[in-house]
Amino acid sequence: MTTREYDYIICGAGSAGNVLATRLTEDPNVTVLLLEAGGPDYRFDFRTQMPAALAYPLQGRRYNWAYETDPEPHMDNRRMECGRGKGLGGSSLINGMCYIRGNALDYDNWATHQGLENWTYLDCLPYFKKAETRDIGPNDYHGGDGPVSVTTSKPGVNPLFEAMVEAGVQAGYPRTEDLNGYQQEGFGPMDRTVTPKGRRASTARGYLDQAKTRPNLEIVTHALADRILFDGKRASGVTYLRGNERATAHARREVLVCSGAIASPQLLQRSGVGPGAWLKELDIPIVLDLPGVGQNLQDHLEMYIQYECKEPVSLYPALKWWNQPKIGLEWMLNGTGLGASNHFEAGGFIRTRDDDPWPNIQYHFLPVAINYNGSNAIEMHGFQAHVGSMRSPSRGRVKLRSRDPNAHPSILFNYMAEALDWREFRDAIRATREIMRQPALDRYRGRELNPGADLKSDKELDAFVRARAETAFHPSCSCKMGYDDMAVVDNEGRVHGLEGLRVVDASIMPIITTGNLNAPTIMIAEKIADKIRGRKPLERANVPYFVANGAPARNVAKAVRQPETV
């Protein structure tokens, strides 16, 4: 067994861990050990580097932990997919590359919780900007010299994108030019984490590329964190496995857990920090009975509303193997073409009821009919909307099954456990059908393939959701930030009741944000990095942002009305 000593040990080189490793080692007097259970960020592997290949990493286990849930009781007892990134970059290495920060009111809502007053949107915005380089330049809402490359959608990429956005507007919903700017609510172009050369902009590329040559940063891959070590109530180090070899590293200052919403509570529980009754079941010595560890688990559930496309403008031909070498060659040589986009270039956020204070439904538009993980491709020209609710009241949990660090935990999201979930999904299907019926899509819209136009009653729609809805791969909130009895960390990520230990990743969100989670996770890490370094927070932003204040969710008077049948 080898033993070494560092100022900080970071467990997990993902969206948050790479931010911390980079920011902490800006101080040459600080030493950092970054542990990653997966392998390097192989730049020659098109599966992780080509944006259009985003489904491939989810189909194997090289880059994906490939967790499965326990049978979900409200989803026909299905064991559902729970993909999480494995390798330098973490889930930013395998995600859909949608750059969505969340709604301003997400953060203002966090700040209404005791002790989280400094997590308002205006407190967080400077850290979003710090992390970002937007291809069309900075403004009051966007950064221009950060590590994360953000590419904006350009007109003319595919006519279906513009048609679907226009259809949303024709249905009476707002148009927005920037889902990350003044107004998230509405339909418009979607930003993505792709470099100017058409490569995936993971945090391994954006952050670690500038930090990995620093002498005060040691990166160890294929290193699976086993347990956090404690000296009394103070975290003193980490034991980890590299193959069959066990190693120990000691932390002079802090251990920083950045393993994600599944593995962070798993590591804490394995180390003796968690619900006491759970730990006793596995004969784990209790360091601290902390009941919230692994509780409050949240995710976004989504469904695919799919249509036949009457004109041959979809991406269906790109799914054929004989067309893919040409696409790949253009991407490899020039960084352009179909391979250089994730093809989520338009989308939106709407309120389905006037009394919703901010959007409760998200749309990703896609000019092909296929599941996110590449399965169940429709054998014809088609298009779809990925549609899902944003702040489900259902809560799940992550529970340790075994002391073996290689064993997956028990995961239960408890999807669709509340009546509000069902109402929102029914509303979402009906709103989507109304959008898809608008004149902007007349030349393209064929048959409704899924759910199928004949499914109309609440009972029929509910059965479709139970059988066909899937994860959006946004697990979060399982080590929540706050000061109530179920909070795990304080407003700086420090674990309650312990010293020298923080959790910094999507697990500390108290409530899931409205949209994709990579950008908020990076922001959280940027913000807490300043806290760890003892630096003064960035100056609070002073910009306006949209608040509905009870305004109608859609302008029915301006909506173009069409028959319900297609």
From Swiss-Prot:
One function term, GO molecular function aspect: flavin adenine dinucleotide binding
Region (Disordered): 182-204
Domain of life: Bacteria
Enzyme Commission number, as recorded: 1.1.99.1, 1.2.1.8
Cofactor(s) demanded: FAD
Pfam families cross-referenced by the UniProt entry: GMC_oxred_C, GMC_oxred_N
Pathway named in the protein's UniProt entry: Amine and polyamine biosynthesis; betaine biosynthesis via choline pathway; betaine aldehyde from choline (cytochrome c reductase route): step 1/1
Alphabetized UniProt keyword annotations: FAD, Flavoprotein, NAD, Oxidoreductase
Active site: 474 (proton acceptor)
Catalysed transformations (reactions): choline + A = betaine aldehyde + AH2; betaine aldehyde + NAD(+) + H2O = glycine betaine + NADH + 2 H(+)
One annotated GO biological process: glycine betaine biosynthetic process from choline
Gene Ontology CC: membrane
Residues involved in FAD binding: 7-36
The protein's enzyme class: oxidoreductase
Similarity annotation: Belongs to the GMC oxidoreductase family.
Function: Involved in the biosynthesis of the osmoprotectant glycine betaine. Catalyzes the oxidation of choline to betaine aldehyde and betaine aldehyde to glycine betaine at the same rate.
Record PANTHER family: CHOLINE DEHYDROGENASE, MITOCHONDRIAL (PTHR11552:SF147), GLUCOSE-METHANOL-CHOLINE GMC OXIDOREDUCTASE (PTHR11552)
The protein's name in its UniProt record: Oxygen-dependent choline dehydrogenase
